[in-house]
Amino acid sequence: MSYRIGIDIESISDVQAAAEKHKQFLDKVLTKSEQKQLAGRKGNGYYAYLAGRFSSKEAYAKATGFGIGSKVNFTDIEILDDENGAPRLSVSGRSLFLNAKSYQISISHKIKLDLVATEVLIEVEDGNSDS
């Protein structure tokens, strides 16, 4: 087994500004299911959630080594809260990292500091870690 790790840090207010400036931002970054979870958030939680998902998808792209755009699309990556509120990552389409055995994700918000930090760990079967 081998592991691929991606880490990202984003400014919550920068993500907020992008979402407010570009009407298509939510549709380009979030799946329909993620948008439904976002709609239930109020106040600071709304943009913290959005920044967390954006940052997590950036971290996933870094872990794969492809980056967003070439082989990884934002909406092929979905991060939904489970019944306990923990984020769970799933991937489809051309963003699927072949030979991935599992995905782990961590999202940390520091609203007073205007930051979200994320980490994605991909457990890969040995032998071929490329897609």
From Swiss-Prot:
Name this polypeptide is given: Holo-[acyl-carrier-protein] synthase
Gene3D superfamilies assigned: 4'-phosphopantetheinyl transferase domain (3.90.470.20)
GN (gene name): acpS
HAMAP family membership: AcpS
Principal location listed in the UniProt entry: cytoplasm
Keyword entries, A-Z: Cytoplasm, Fatty acid biosynthesis, Fatty acid metabolism, Lipid biosynthesis, Lipid metabolism, Magnesium, Metal-binding, Transferase
EC number from the UniProt entry: 2.7.8.7
Entry function: Transfers the 4'-phosphopantetheine moiety from coenzyme A to a Ser of acyl-carrier-protein.
Catalytic activity, reaction form: apo-[ACP] + CoA = holo-[ACP] + adenosine 3',5'-bisphosphate + H(+)
Organism: Oenococcus oeni (strain ATCC BAA-331 / PSU-1)
GO CC terms of this entry: cytoplasm
